[in-house]
Amino acid sequence: MSKSFGNVVDPHEVIDTFGADPFRYFLFREVPFGLDGDFSRHALIKRFNTDLANDLGNLLSRTLSMIEKYFEGIVPDPSLQADDAETPLPGALQLKHQAESISSAFDLSLEKLSFGHAIDTVWDTINNANKFIEDEAPWNLYKTNNMQKLSRVLYTLAETLRIIAVYLFPFMPSTAEKMWKQLNLAHDIAGVTLQIESQWGGLRPGTKICKGPALFPRIETDKTL
């Protein structure tokens, strides 16, 4: 980049337009630490709309909206059992295992200063959580009054979001704090430790969620390019 060519990126202008967290996210994902990288508003907007709005934002919004709709905003108890034998729920167990297993690849990536790879491990979990919603179709569970399975599905999603927020905090602190508050977790996310908060079960059933506005409203390309 060169001032004489007029292609210098003003970070303050980018932050004013897109926000600090999306800009940080883009740089971590697109630019290897310590190396040169390319920046374009088009690429940032694509990351914003695809990764942040569609993947993460929709996962939080859909999960909390269903908890509001089906459980009056109260995090359901996944241990509720039907009178008959519990039906296995492989998808929930798989997502739980993946959320619990983020730490190994995440820690190794940080040791190597591979911040993009660290975020990749978190995004793999986000993508699988979205797939879990489509596979289990909670709306159909509600229609058939399968509240036991619905409880387990929605608790699994909400607890996965809690763990995701913990891992995102070093990279996107404002976003992680918003997720934390919408899950209505009492303690400050800035004071948590990965070793403790990455363990499954930190979100207590019976917690009243506080769903807020969309984390990342989609950007209309023609208004920003």
State the predicted function of each range.
Residues 3, 14-15, 44-55, 87-99, ...:
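Secondary-structure capping and boundary motifs in well-ordered enzyme cores
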Residues 37, 108, 112-114, 123-225:
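Basic, alpha-helical terminal appendages of large translation-related enzymes
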Residues 36-41, 100-108:
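Short, charged/polar, low-complexity loop and linker segments
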Residues 1-84, 186-207, 211-223:
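Catalytic adenosine-cofactor/nucleotide-binding cores of aminoacyl-tRNA synthetases and other
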Residues 53, 57-67, 119, 123-126, ...:
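Short, hydrophobic, well-ordered secondary-structure elements
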Residues 8-10, 102-104, 162-164:
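Short hydrophobic "helix-edge" motifs at membrane interfaces and signal-peptide entry regions
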Residues 60-106, 126, 130-146:
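Conserved, charged catalytic cores of large soluble enzymes
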